[in-house]
């Protein structure tokens, strides 16, 4: 693992400095080194780590990747039967390296596997992919440069360490010699307290968390002027979240990036406090340092300039591929170019993300990506959240419909149609609008377009037609 040699360095240079702080407990660099090194002799060649956020998690993770060891991080919130299934799969599928009880707390060979990552698939069992130590070392170098991570930063990633965004944030800080903080569980009040009292200068989180923290922070007069950097991933920042974040943390540069667990970083952009945002834009910036991006069709051929197709990346940050669950579609390669099937195009301003091909709406022979419609709707005053889908239609094949959650009071179809005239092309605008009491979300917490269509078909009380 590329951060273990760095832990040794920071423990020598700054033994009493804080390395990790979780739920009020702190570990200095010397303590982290000592506790992790003491665990290495009893740590097997392949570890499945399934723990809530804690100091012990950080120690065990460091020990679990010493030398040639490999680690799979499981979500403790998963059902016990699923956890047991994954543990069995890891133990039977992984190719363990030779390890010894006298191994030091040190990085293994750059090309060796250290991480067995788990990512949601179409089945109940997550897909598993593997990563080399070199891939994360290259990722660290790129992200530290792009996000401007400094040793005097204090990073707070309030989500679960089992999620790749937060696990990477921990490892990146250990590599950079910068303090990392998280919480036992996400709690708005606890995050606000950390921002106010624990010298936090940097937030790493998903857009839904940022919106909640910003809006409640503004209401509660929580001072976030000390935040220098906000890093978001997981979905595109909508206009309302961005506006609230800029008001709450007025001195922060807000970064968002596009990537995938299997690909690592692909593109990104940073918006300084003085820059105006691009309302409703699908652009997610320019290629990340060390990454090349192109758009290829399904045969692996370049599309015409500005054309839609598979977003493909070529870099040393890409994973090794799947350990299990490879359906031939989730991660595809065209020579040195790799894609997870996200669709987009390259414009003068950078890479534009349109979403997954499976979500595409085919209406009157035209392709419409609901992600683009949703971003435009979220930029409309009075809209708190939005979701678009393709409803079967005898005339068009499918027609674009949209549901919105109002931010306050009521909203009309006329208001929505008028607001989209200058943002979306005519053939991309919804033909029917619905007001929602809440977003349609699956049992796994994912927003579902199919569930929206089910609500509409069954006249669910959570959805009400606004007319055409």
Enumerate the language-model features and the residues they cover.
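AMP-binding/adenylate-forming catalytic core of the ANL superfamily
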Residues: 203, 315, 321, 336, ...
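Conserved AMP-binding/adenylation subdomain of ANL enzymes
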Residues: 138-154, 162-202
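Conserved AMP-binding A3 loop
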Residues: 28-29, 114-141
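AMP-binding/adenylate-forming catalytic domain of the ANL superfamily
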Residues: 425-446, 466
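Conserved beta-loop-beta connector loops within the AMP-binding
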Residues: 292-313, 348, 409-413, 448
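Conserved ATP/PPi-binding loop(s) of AMP-dependent carboxylate-activating enzymes
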Residues: 286-290, 301-331, 368
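Gly/Ser/Thr-rich phosphate-binding loop
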Residues: 202, 216-279
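Conserved AMP-binding/adenylate-forming core of the ANL superfamily
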Residues: 3, 8, 14-43, 83-84, ...
């Amino acid at each position: 693992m590329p951060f273990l040699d760095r832990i040794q360095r920071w423990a020598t240079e700054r033994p009493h400095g804080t390395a990790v702080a979780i739920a009020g407990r702190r570990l200095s660099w010397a303590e982290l080194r000592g506790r992790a090194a003491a665990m290495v002799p009893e740590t097997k060649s392949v570890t499945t780590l399934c723990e809530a956020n804690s100091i012990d998690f950080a120690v065990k993770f460091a020990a679990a990747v010493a030398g040639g060891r490999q680690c799979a991080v499981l979500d403790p919130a998963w059902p016990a039967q699923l956890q047991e299934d994954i543990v069995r799969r890891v133990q039977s599928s992984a190719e363990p390296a030779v390890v010894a009880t006298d191994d030091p707390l040190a990085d293994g060979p750059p090309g060796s596997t250290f991480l067995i990552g788990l990512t949601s698939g179409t089945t109940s069992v997550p897909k598993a992919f593997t990563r080399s130590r070199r891939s994360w070392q290259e990722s660290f170098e790129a992200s530290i440069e792009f996000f401007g991570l400094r040793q005097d930063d204090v990073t707070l990633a309030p989500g679960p360490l089992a999620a790749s965004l937060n696990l990477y944030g921990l490892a990146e800080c250990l590599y950079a010699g910068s303090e990392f903080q998280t919480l036992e569980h996400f709690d708005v009040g606890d995050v606000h307290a950390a921002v106010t009292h624990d010298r936090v200068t940097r937030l790493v989180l998903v857009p839904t968390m940022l919106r909640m923290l910003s809006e409640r922070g503004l209401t509660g007069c929580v001072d976030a002027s000390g935040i220098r950097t906000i890093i978001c991933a997981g979905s595109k920042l909508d206009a309302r979240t961005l506006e609230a974040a800029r008001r709450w943390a007025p001195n922060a540069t807000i970064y968002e990036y596009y990537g995938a667990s299997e690909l690592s970083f692909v593109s990104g952009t940073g918006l300084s406090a003085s820059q105006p945002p691009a309302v409703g834009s699908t652009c997610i910036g320019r290629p990340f340092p060390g990454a090349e991006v192109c758009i290829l069709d399904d045969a692996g051929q370049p599309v015409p300039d500005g054309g839609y197709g598979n977003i493909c990346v070529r870099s040393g940050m890409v994973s090794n591929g799947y350990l299990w669950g490879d359906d031939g579609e989730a991660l595809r390669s065209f020579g040195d170019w790799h894609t997870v099937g996200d669709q987009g195009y390259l414009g003068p301003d950078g890479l534009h993300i349109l979403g997954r091909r499976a979500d595409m709406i085919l209406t009157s022979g035209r392709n419409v990506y609901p992600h683009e419609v949703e971003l435009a709707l979220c930029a409309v005053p009075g809209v708190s959240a939005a979701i678009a889908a393709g409803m079967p239609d005898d005339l068009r094949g499918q027609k674009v419909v949209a549901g919105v959650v109002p931010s306050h009071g009521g909203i009309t179809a006329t208001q929505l149609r008028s607001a989209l005239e200058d943002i979306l092309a005519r053939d991309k605008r919804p033909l029917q609008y619905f007001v929602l009491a809440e977003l349609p979300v699956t049992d796994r917490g994912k927003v579902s377009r199919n569930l929206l269509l089910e609500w509409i078909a069954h006249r669910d009380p959570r959805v009400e037609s606004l007319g055409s």
